[in-house]
């Protein structure tokens, strides 16, 4: 079943390649959405796709070298039409 999640990540998530790794992992799982750095050292993301793909994506992201996720604030939001996962500046 398709789902969309809005997520705030905190921890060591900026300056460690988080956005680029998230983009690579999301594209490899055919997920759509976006990711961006926030001024308060957190990262914000919306990710959409099959629920099992989103769960595996988040597990893979937590297992990446240099990235240390201390907390994820996640909410389910309505799906939207989009065709790719991208970094937002």
Where are these regions (language model features)?
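Intrinsically disordered, low-complexity, mixed-charge
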Residues: 1-89
């Amino acid at each position: 079943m398709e789902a969309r999640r809005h997520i705030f990540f905190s921890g060591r998530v900026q300056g460690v390649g988080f956005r680029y790794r998230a983009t690579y992992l999301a594209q490899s799982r055919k997920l759509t959405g976006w990711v961006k750095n926030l001024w308060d050292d957190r990262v914000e993301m919306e990710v959409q796709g099959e629920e099992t793909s989103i769960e595996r994506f988040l597990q893979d992201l937590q297992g990446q070298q240099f990235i240390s996720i201390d907390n994820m604030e996640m909410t389910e939001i309505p799906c939207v039409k989009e065709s790719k996962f991208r970094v937002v500046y």
